[in-house]
Structures are given as structure tokens and as C-alpha cells.
């Protein structure tokens, strides 16, 4: 037993004498990859509104239709700098996966969610969160009623802006259509006069 103690004492387990300068745990990558620029397709858009919220979609395809959580993250209202189109975009917090992506149209209407002053419900004809666009009934819930009201105010401003822009574009299209119709009438009259002139000769 004494011999076992002696051998244990002789064995030095301390790390004081080891030279740390020889240890260099630096690894070179096997394959070098060039840095890639990541595009979110938000570069050409101006951020009008951004706030944290939780999004739900109404799953009517189930046997028992119910609200299903789609994600928690920042909801944004983005306006395209050239086209002027405004869309609602929401990404999940950690994965940054899109959970809502659709244009705001004049027909959209935010309705209060039953029993809550901090949630809104609305319909969209084409939500692009999944691979293919599909109509959705969405609900969004904010931290408090004040944040929910801020969202509604900005959403309504955007909706009215789109409505006014479409009215202006619509009246411009009508003016253009009338001008084209007048030109067509003038052309047909000229053709008739040419035909009349040929018949007279």
C-alpha cells in the first residue's frame, strides 16, 4: 500500500511546467467560400412602420376550423420607392422565415378581434408567405392596445394612399382611352373618305 502511495506522489499531474506557447488551435478552412451579398428584396422599399407582434391565420381546411399561430416577429409596412405599392411583411424572429407578405389594397379593412382591444383581423386575396399566393384570413396581436391602435392608424393611411393613387391612375386611364378612341374614329373617317374618293373616280 505504501508503494502505491509513493508512485502516486511521484507522478506529477500539475500543468504548471507545460509550455502554452506551443499550443496553437488555429484551423484553416478546407474550402474557402467567397462572401455573398444577401438580398432581402427590401432594398428598394421605404419602411413606413415596424413593430413587434404575433400573427395568426384561420385554418378553415381542418375538420374543426381554428386560429393557428403563424409566428412572432416584426411586422413592417413597406412602400416601394418607384412603384409606390405598399405591402405588409412579417418575418419570424429567429429563422427570419416570412409569415405574412401581401400588398395592401383599398378593399382591405381591419376589424377588431372579438374580446381584445390589441388585436385586428383582415382578409387578403393573395398572401405570398408560402410558395404560391393564396387567400388568407389573418389576425395580428400586439403587446398592448396603444401599439394596436398605432398599427391601425398607419394601415388606414396606407390603404387610403393606395385608394387615391388608383383613382388618379383610373382617371388617367379613362382620359387615355378616350384619346385613343378619338384617334381611331379619325382614322376610320379618313379611310372612308379615301374609299369615297376612289368610288367617285
UniProtKB/Swiss-Prot annotation:
Q: What does this protein do?
A: Plays a role in RAN-dependent nucleocytoplasmic transport. Alleviates the TNPO1-dependent inhibition of RAN GTPase activity and mediates the dissociation of RAN from proteins involved in transport into the nucleus. Induces a conformation change in the complex formed by XPO1 and RAN that triggers the release of the nuclear export signal of cargo proteins. Promotes the disassembly of the complex formed by RAN and importin beta. Promotes dissociation of RAN from a complex with KPNA2 and CSE1L. Required for normal mitotic spindle assembly and normal progress through mitosis via its effect on RAN.
SUPFAM superfamilies linked: PH domain-like (SSF50729)
- Residues carrying N-acetylalanine: 2
Could you tell me which residues carry N6-acetyllysine? 150, 183
One GO biological process term: nucleocytoplasmic transport
Q: How does it assemble?
A: Interacts with RAN (via C-terminus of GTP-bound form) but not with GDP-bound RAN. Identified in a complex composed of RAN, RANGAP1 and RANBP1. Identified in a complex that contains TNPO1, RAN and RANBP1. Identified in a complex that contains CSE1L, KPNA2, RAN and RANBP1. Identified in a complex with nucleotide-free RAN and RCC1.
Q: What is this protein called?
A: Ran-specific GTPase-activating protein
What domain of life? Eukaryota
Q: Where is the composition biased (Basic and acidic residues)?
A: 1-26
Q: Which residues carry this modification: N6-succinyllysine?
A: 150
Q: Which residues are annotated as modified residue Phosphoserine in the UniProt record? A: 21, 60, 188
Phosphothreonine PTM positions: 13, 18
Matches recorded under PANTHER family: RAN BINDING PROTEIN, RAN BINDING PROTEIN 1
One molecular function GO term is:
small GTPase binding
Q: Name one Pfam family in it.
A: Ran_BP1
Gene Ontology CC terms: centrosome; cytoplasm; cytosol; nuclear envelope; nuclear pore; nucleus
The RanBD1 domain extends over 26-164
Q: Which organism is it from?
A: Homo sapiens
Q: Which UniProt keywords apply?
A: Acetylation, GTPase activation, Isopeptide bond, Phosphoprotein, Ubl conjugation
SMART domains attached to this UniProt entry:
RanBD
Q: Which InterPro entries match?
A: PH-like_dom_sf, Ran_bind_dom, RanBP1-like, RanBP1_RanBD
UniProt family annotation: Belongs to the RANBP1 family.
Keyword Transferase among UniProt keywords: no
Q: Where is this region: Disordered?
A: 1-35, 163-201
Placement of covalent cross-link Glycyl lysine isopeptide (Lys-Gly) (interchain with G-Cter in SUMO2) = 190
